[in-house]
Each structure stands twice: as C-alpha cells, then as structure tokens.
C-alpha cells in the first residue's frame, strides 16, 4: 500500500469554500477505478494550511467513510508544534487510516537535533506507521540524510517522502538507512528517475488528473521496465511542470474541474484562482498528455 502511485489528494470545495462530499466521493472512486495504490488525505495538496484542525479531522474521517476499505488512506498529521502533531496522530489511531504523513515543522525552522527530537517524540507517543515528509522549499528546513538514518531505527517510522527533487539524496539515504526503509518521491517531474535509482513510488500531484497514467508509470518502473515507463512519462512531462507554474494546488484544482472530476476549483485565501496565462499552459500540457477533457 505504500509503494507505487499514491495520490496527494486535492480537497474539493463548493463555491462557499465548504467541503464538497459529492466531488470527494467522485475523486475517490476515480482513484479506485484507476488502481491508485493509496490516498494521502490532507497533505499540502489537500490544503492543510487553510483548514481548521476540526475540518482536517472531519475530512480524513469522511475520506475513510467514502473509501470504505477499498483503498488505503494515509492521513496528513504534520504540525509546527510537536505536541500538536502527536495529538493529531493519536486522533487517527483507531480510525482505520493505514498510516500518517508527517511533514517537518515549517516556519520555525528547527535544527537537525530539533527535527530528530520532534519525530522521535511522535514515534514514541503514537502507534501508527509514520512516513516522514521533507519539502524544504515550503518548510524552510531540510531533513538531512544523516537525521533520516537516525530516525529510521524507530520501528513505526517506515519511510520518507523526499520532495527536494535532488536525485543525489536517494543514494545518500539508501547508504545510511535500514534496507526495508521506504523511499518515496514527492516530486512528479523526477519521480521516475527516483524510482530507477531505487525508490519505491511517488506521492503524486499529477495523479489527481492522470491517475491511470501515474499508476502505469510506477507499475512498469517497479517491474524494471523503464522503456514503457518513460514512454508514458514523456507525455506527462509538460503536465508535471505546468502543475507547479503557480503554487500547488491552484493549477491541479483548476484542471480537475476542467476535466470534470470536481464541481468547483474553489480555494481558500490566501490561495487565489489560476491566472489566464497559466490556464493556457495547463491546456497545452493536458493536450500533449492526451488526457480527455470533458
């Protein structure tokens, strides 16, 4: 469940900014039909930063309800404060989630020792499998391979979503961690290269609107068939890039609406609607990818 194509699911909202159950159910069914391996609920792409903790919990629980055991659900549980991350993680322990994705604290920029103590405390006070999440471009701090290696010795810290886009990282981490520690890409544009170097999958933004294609890329890659994997990935390269012309999830929500997966591409401030110039690039990318637009 923690290998292959895992979608970093968008959070569909109605025009008033409230959660749209109908669109969420449609998205979940789309991923089940496309054989996506698992769903990450309320990560960066799910707009965790603009949701209250009550909304955060309710959306994860609704996702579990709608998934109904048909696809594993991973809950985003990262927080700036260690006590809050522990509390949120414990909230999901009896919920049925398959595991948690825990981003490094952001804005307060802890040292490597601070990061180690943060994740150590979460591990020692909770039971769910934990996937570390390193995305320095957003958080302002970088979880270095040596710190990852120390954390890999905790039994419930099972892997890392590495979203630096730096492919040299995978070699450094692989040399230092135990052999069963999962290495998952968090960067669609370099995910295939990441897997060729020994990674086990990707937590993907692109999968929101190209679920079948991302599943096929990962499936081929994990079998060692990089010829077929690259053939599909080549069609998606413009899309991988276009989805980050503006901050995620602005572009991907607009495209999800464009192809009929959600009713509205509503975002909460300070996120604002996609620019006309970006729409042009997204339409070009979706045409090149040969994905159907409704």
From Swiss-Prot:
Gene3D superfamilies linked to this entry: Aldolase class I
Assigned EC number: 4.3.3.7
Active site per UniProt: 133 (proton donor/acceptor), 161 (schiff-base intermediate with substrate)
Molecular functions per Gene Ontology: 4-hydroxy-tetrahydrodipicolinate synthase activity
Residues annotated as binding pyruvate: 45, 203
Pathway note: Amino-acid biosynthesis; L-lysine biosynthesis via DAP pathway; (S)-tetrahydrodipicolinate from L-aspartate: step 3/4
Quaternary structure annotation from Swiss-Prot or TrEMBL: Homotetramer; dimer of dimers.
Family: Belongs to the DapA family.
Name of the protein this chain belongs to: 4-hydroxy-tetrahydrodipicolinate synthase
Gene: dapA
